[in-house]
Amino acid sequence: MKRILTLCAMLLMLVAGASCKKNNKSMNNQIDKQEKILFINGSPNCEGNTAALAKVLLEGKEYETLNLTDYRINVYGQTLDGDQFDEVYKKMKDADIVVMGSPVYWHNICASVRVLLERFYGPIESGSFKGKKLFFLYQGAAPTKMMIDDGEYTMSRFAGMYGFTYEGMANGKSQARKLKEKL
């Protein structure tokens, strides 16, 4: 009987050890996998204030910058040659975290970001970005509370419709530093 109990105990330790090793390996893979971050800069000034705000938020992180001014994205409903929406969409799908940056123009999100958002409507299924995070950087020269609220409303609705987890908005460096905690 002692021998059977000893064998059972050894077998239990062997199984438990293998299970722990498997779980540990799984945890290491999660730690080793660095999240892929895409910063979409809607500003026509690629090195301007929107990009500077992204640098504050993403300091110490590896990320890719996609300047919308470098892409031709036709407005919703146009079917012109040379449209690059699919390229931008693919980069967004490949990312774990998307940081959308827009200057405040005419009291709202800039046209290049607006066109990108509008192009999702229709061809892109709701919930397509489930499990991905969206951060919003929205800056301008003294935007009013209404402008900030409207921009955030638009971005949070976009995130909700397409399945992103909306992590929030920053419109200044101190807010970007605080938002960085969610990365």
Give the ranges of each region predicted by the language model.
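Sec-dependent signal peptide recognition
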Residues: 2-7
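Alpha-helical transmembrane segments and their juxtamembrane interfaces
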Residues: 12-13, 77
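C-terminal motif of bacterial Sec signal peptides marking the signal peptidase cleavage site
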Residues: 15-19
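N-terminal beta1-alpha1-beta2 submodule of the flavodoxin-like/Rossmannoid cofactor-binding fold
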Residues: 20-125, 156, 160-183
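Short, glycine-/small-residue-rich phosphate/pyrophosphate-handling segment
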Residues: 130-168
